Amino acid sequence: MASLDKNMLLNYVPVYVMLPLGVVSVNNVFEDPEGLKEQLVQLREAGVDGVMVDVWWGIIEQKGPKQYDWSAYKSLFQLVQECGLKLQAIMSFHQCGGNVGDVVNIPIPQWVLDIGESDPDIFYTNRSGTRDKEYLTIGVDNKPIFHGRTAIEVYSDYMKSFRENMSDFLKSEVIIDIEVGLGPAGELRYPSYPQNQGWVFPGIGEFQCYDKYLKAEFKAAAARAGHSEWELPDDAGTYNDVPESTEFFKTNGTYLTEKGKFFLTWYSNQLLNHGDEILDEANKAFLGCKVNLAIKVSGIHWWYKAQNHAAELTAGYYNLDDRDGYRPIAKMVSRHHASLNFTCLEMRDSEQSSDAQSGPQELVQQVLSGGWRENIEVAGENALSRYDATAYNQIILNARPQGVNKDGPPKHRMYGVTYLRLSDELLQQSNFDIFKKFVVKMHADQDYCEDPQEYNHGIPPLKRSEPKIPVDVLNEATKPIPPFPWDSETDMKVDG
């Protein structure tokens, strides 16, 4: 292997691998440490920098309010440390089960579900009244209905307890990333396309703001705007519609009217504010730790090439050809010294069926460029498991869109990429051989580098968030700016 070249190291993009969903069981048991250790040793030998793991609220606080049990996760983290890997920990305040690739079922804590029995409006709700129990509605963020605590206080207490109980791993800088879950699948979005309610790709999804709390907030906002007669949309169709079959999204539809724009601005602002408030709590909880805070944004690539961007709009990303729905999120993230994690890095437009009007490549370019323009770090992951050179090459291209620079840092470089996900299939000889090549190419043909400072990733102690940015200032970032240029293919192919 080549020794470490100082200039080439500045092109190094660390690679993490997501651990299996059920590594800690729903009963809070670390199931198969020996089996996992074998796999982690293989990852370490392949040059992988670290692993990512969901730290499930539904496992840790399942016994009752503030009754946390971190023991199984401590054993897991100990093993990761012994194997010489870094850790990205996700504060997973959502249910596992009901989304793409969910093979395990981990509901949110039973005592929270019990509150939902008497008050089902704590859950996101669509227009027909179906509740989604995978994550609490934004409407209860500041409602003290969880045994005297608000939802945000519940999340905040959980993160503080994590810091207290995992202080050894934080001090030894084994844990380098805290990804703060902000919605279903841990993503800052509404649960607009739930498979467990019958959604199938490429359905436009549904708005999820019909619980009594969000409904009341919308009515109050409409009244303040002098339109107390305005109601939430009733013409946006159902999960598996195409945009043109709905009054809301069709050409010259409701989404372009004053009322439609008011609703979409309100709906997306709710999400911005939700992320902002919880990141503020995360920043307080981990203040002074040498960790990166991160949030995850979903790659909703279907209907991206349609004028209405319907699937993005129902998820809360108010993104149109003349309005950037992602840069305001990056601006919000920037005040907390946090980074943005994006998905679908492996996808190419040519692999998508034309009737979904899908644009994953343009979407990735838009979101990454927006993050870089707001001076934040951007990381990412693949959306679906892939083991082929084409997918790996696409990820490498997105990680360094203008290629490597042999004389220093490249023009743009992603902060890291997390591969989804560790499995027996990944470790099959032929699959693992190409994965190992992928790691080497992400590392710019350099050996594994133990010290992140060598590739400009030293992590300073987390500083306190900057002052709150008013939402109308955040929304100044909706002005579209063309993305940075992207090479047509990577200069570091796994099969080159």
From Swiss-Prot:
Catalytic activity reported: Hydrolysis of (1->4)-alpha-D-glucosidic linkages in polysaccharides so as to remove successive maltose units from the non-reducing ends of the chains
Keyword Zinc-finger included in the entry's annotation: no
Residues that hold substrate according to the record: 54, 94, 102, 296, 301, 343, 382-383, 421
Single GO term (MF): beta-amylase activity
UniProt KW keywords: Carbohydrate metabolism, Glycosidase, Hydrolase, Polysaccharide degradation
Active site, per annotation: 187 (proton donor), 381 (proton acceptor)
Keyword Hydrolase attributed: yes
GO-annotated biological processes: polysaccharide catabolic process
Gene3D superfamilies: Glycosidases
Disulfide cross-links: none
Top EC class, one word: hydrolase
Enzyme Commission number, as recorded: 3.2.1.2
PROSITE patterns linked: BETA_AMYLASE_1, BETA_AMYLASE_2
Domain of life of the organism encoding this protein: Eukaryota
Similarity annotation: Belongs to the glycosyl hydrolase 14 family.
UniProt xrefs under PANTHER family: BETA-AMYLASE 1, CHLOROPLASTIC, BETA-AMYLASE 6
Protein name per Swiss-Prot or TrEMBL: Beta-amylase
Lineage, top ranks: Eukaryota, Viridiplantae, Streptophyta, Embryophyta, Tracheophyta
